[in-house]
């Protein structure tokens, strides 16, 4: 068994903290929350301190922040229905179009596309058209309820979204007319899907839900060895594993480490749990076991967790309790 060692507890935000995001270099991170401010933190010596506070971009709670793959830009999604793009401590662009709260924002791996989603049930795809210019490339209305999270595939221009309608949707650009289409609907959860994350190679996806489970989904491409039918020659996603009985309340976030393959979950029971794929796991019927659980990681709901993209085993979390914590996994 492994265990999580608490390395740092950081305070600075007023009220609940909704999101944290590691910089691609892994040596700094951004945080956001109820106080309408974004904080950029970096390490000097053995302490983490706020280097910058970005406070003039939004009128309401900031739900999520995400760095561009190059690390030059930061996008923030807010309940004020806008998404702001920041560079060098300035707000360079504000993306408007959603009718109400923007819940999530994500950059494609190339950095050329941005996705946003909202309580208005829509997913928007934006093209980076030049210096601080963003053009709406698509408005996708595949979900029937509030959309909670958008995440791009790690190498392909495929987008995944998770919703209050209990489903996950996949989108890709059509080769025929360059329109964006919903290519798959992933149904198995029995309540809101709060978050999703791809495995490093993008062939599997983990999801977490209000139904207290995690699910692992696998992509089956046309001509797959398993003999899974692929109508219209499109990739089919199947739920190949359900992790149940490990969380006592809603699971709000999940992070699949691109370095170690470990999965971290953030839960409404104030806990953080780490899952590891079993050594005898089968390709089409994988099994994941609980490696370690930090039952009282925070004093209130844990809203987000994210593995450091560079430093294996380092995990960041944030909570309604107004703190950010940095953990080190000892296996």
UniProtKB/Swiss-Prot annotation:
It comes from the Eukaryota. One of its GO terms (biological process) is iron-sulfur cluster assembly. InterPro entries: CIAO1/Cia1, G-protein_beta_WD-40_rep, WD40/YVTN_repeat-like_dom_sf, WD40_repeat_CS, WD40_repeat_dom_sf, WD40_rpt. Belongs to the WD repeat CIA1 family. HAMAP family: ciao1. PANTHER family: CYTOSOLIC IRON-SULFUR PROTEIN ASSEMBLY PROTEIN CIAO1-RELATED, WD40 PROTEIN CIAO1. This is Probable cytosolic iron-sulfur protein assembly protein Ciao1. It comes from Drosophila grimshawi.
């Amino acid at each position: 068994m492994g265990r999580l060692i608490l390395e740092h507890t950081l305070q600075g935000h007023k009220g609940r903290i909704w999101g944290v995001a590691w910089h691609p270099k892994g040596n700094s991170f951004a945080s956001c929350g109820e106080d309408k401010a974004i904080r950029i933190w970096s390490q000097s010596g053995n302490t983490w301190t706020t280097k910058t506070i970005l406070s003039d971009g939004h009128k309401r709670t900031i739900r999520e922040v995400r760095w561009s793959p190059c690390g030059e830009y930061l996008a923030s999604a807010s309940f004020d229905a806008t998404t702001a793009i920041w560079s060098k401590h300035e707000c360079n662009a504000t993306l408007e179009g959603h009718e109400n709260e923007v819940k999530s924002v994500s950059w494609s791996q190339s950095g050329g596309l941005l996705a946003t989603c909202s309580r208005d049930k829509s997913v928007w795809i934006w093209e980076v058209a030049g210096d601080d210019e963003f053009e709406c490339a698509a408005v996708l209305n595949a979900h029937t309820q509030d959309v909670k999270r958008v995440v791009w595939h790690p190498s392909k221009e495929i987008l995944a979204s998770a919703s209050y309608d209990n489903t996950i949707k996949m989108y890709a650009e059509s080769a025929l007319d360059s329109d964006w289409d919903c290519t798959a609907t992933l149904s198995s959860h029995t309540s809101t899907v709060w978050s999703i994350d791809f495995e490093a190679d993008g062939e599997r996806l983990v999801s977490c839900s209000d139904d207290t489970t995690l699910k692992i989904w696998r992509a089956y491409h046309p001509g797959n060895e398993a003999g899974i039918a692929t109508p219209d020659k499109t990739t089919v996603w199947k739920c190949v594993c359900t992790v149940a009985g490990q969380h006592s309340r809603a699971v709000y976030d999940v992070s699949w480490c691109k370095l170690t393959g470990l999965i971290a979950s953030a839960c409404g029971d104030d806990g953080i749990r780490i899952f590891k794929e079993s050594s005898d796991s089968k390709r089409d019927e994988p099994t994941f076991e609980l490696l370690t659980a930090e039952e009282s990681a925070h004093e209130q709901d844990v809203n987000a967790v994210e593995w450091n993209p560079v430093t294996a085993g380092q995990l960041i979390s944030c909570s309604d309790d107004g703190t950010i914590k940095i953990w080190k996994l000892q296996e």
